[in-house]
Amino acid sequence: MTTTRDIVTAYYAAFNAGDTGAMLALVADDVRHDVNQGEPRHGKALFAEFNAHMTHCYREQLTDMVIFAEGQRAAAEFIVNGTYLATDEGLPEANGQTYRLPGGAFLSVNDAGLIDRVTTYYNLQDWLRQVGA
């Protein structure tokens, strides 16, 4: 039996491998994606669009990952190690700046074993300071 911890671990392994296809295979068609800045995204298509945008603008690896799971819910704490590759609309100009900041996420897994919610938090002001805003 695959556990919530196994599913979330596989999701973040796919993230670190840059394998968006594997990430998408682990999320439900009706996934809800919340980030601490901006509006929630509903559905796999918008989640895929967000990931394509992020891959274009940023290269990130998550380290020091700790995953806590209970039932169908999980939390993850990690360090985001990134490079700002292409200017993201409304943000400072990108020129290869690197950043390192703590982040966290809350996830839930449905009865089919697919992630149906990803809520991610990080400190945007810390990121802006690190990229020279």
Task: Name each region found by the language model.
Residues M1-A133:
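C-terminal and inter-domain tail/linker signature
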